[in-house]
Amino acid sequence: MSARITPQTPALQALRMRLHAQHQPVVLMRTDCHVCRAEGLAPRSQVLIIAGDRTVQALLYQIDSDLLKTGQIALSEAAWDALDIHEGDLVQVRHPPLLESLSAVRARIHGHRLQTTELQAIVRDVVDGRYTDVALSAFLTATAVLPLDMQETIHLTRAMVDVGDHLQWQAPIVVDKHCVGGLPGNRTTPLVVAIAAANGLVMPKTSSRAITSPAGTADTMETLAPVDLDLDTLRKVVEKEGGCVAWGGAMHLSPADDIFVRIERELDIDTQGQLIASVLSKKIAAGATHIVIDIPVGPTAKVRSRETAEHLAHHLSEVAASFGLVLRCLFTDGNQPVGRGIGPALEARDVLAVLRNEADAPQDLCDRVALVAGAVLELGGVAKEGDGIRLAHETISSGRAWEKFQRICAAQGGFREPPQALYVEPLLATTTGRAVHIDNRKLSRLAKLAGAPESSAAGIQLQVRLGDEVTSGQPLMFLHAQTSGEMAYALAYVHDIGDIVNIEP
């Protein structure tokens, strides 16, 4: 978007209001501001803010108070950062240019399939900040009501890759993995990266922070080492150690994905085409050539039936093949959490227990890691077909994975032990019997109410698994919180929702 301050347009003095509105640029102006009157600007309209060669499109709110003078404009943090200005700098305000790509969104609402150029224009405008949340919601809802077909999914994936940065590696094979999700815990990524790198593979893993879950991979890894790496640092870490676990949000890889995901979470929609474009665009941008997809299947996981899992795997494979990617999907048990910890630090402790070969390391996490890492090793060509799981277990038991993980952490800025919560309370069984059902969604909700992931030490430590015999008064789990208020809030939720773990006599 090209615009510059010109003498003909009145300028306003910029003030930093230190308002955090997620990624939404917001500005405040007085209703009697001469620019508002001259331009005919109304509350909640989109405006273009110009500061030298930089521009940002923002949502306008108007006020009637002495908080601002008529010649001033207050900017949110997102707007301030985008313009890179200083307190008191002059900016201009105009109507934004016509958003032509919205015509394609309207066509999609009416059932028309979109071509490459139309999806490219939409994604470009989204990344440039020209789409309001309403317009984004319209686009995503249209692709949910009439799901993306194969060609649209391929076109959208390509468009999402094209607007971001790309990593390229000299190695002919670059491996990656992704878990479709829906399971608390299941923190396999740091372990898989360590195993892959210890066996000579290149695995530049970029991961997300939690959006609605108690922990993302980046949140967990951050309790062990810095994850906020720029592209140059990430490249140096991978070139030195063969792998990394970094926060993808610190880079510009598939930037449209973060925007789409934020709206999808608010709308509580999760469509197959968007999921495929989201996953594969990030893998392609990171330079991956061989990818393992873990698809947990269970009644409270994201994918709830084998049929749905097979359909998703087929479409993932088709889209991946169109980009020359080698992909393998694994269908795994999604009936209960993997590992004992739910929350960044508690999940990190599970990771360390497995890496250090501790006697009480969660066996289910160790087995899941061996399954996923084994597939990565086989796909990467360092293990024969059928021998990957054995090699993964050997890499852990020999200490090679732990040694490599420490080296990766050191390269990323230094290893640290995860923090411990100040408050810990047991949740006790009220009856004797066998554990027959664990509600993943209730567990995730409870861990978040305890403070995760913002309080990295908060969360849940499970003490039972499906099939375990339980005695009344026995701890089913321990609740961890950093403040007494968060602990009380979480305990109140437990009182209101009933059983999280169902026990049958």
Swiss-Prot record:
GO biological process: pyrimidine nucleobase metabolic process; pyrimidine nucleoside metabolic process
UniProt cross-references to Pfam families, sorted A to Z: Glycos_trans_3N, Glycos_transf_3, PYNP_C
Enzyme class: transferase
Keyword ATP-binding found: no
Gene Ontology molecular function terms on file: 1,4-alpha-oligoglucan phosphorylase activity; thymidine phosphorylase activity
UniProt family annotation: Belongs to the thymidine/pyrimidine-nucleoside phosphorylase family. Type 2 subfamily.
Protein name: Putative thymidine phosphorylase
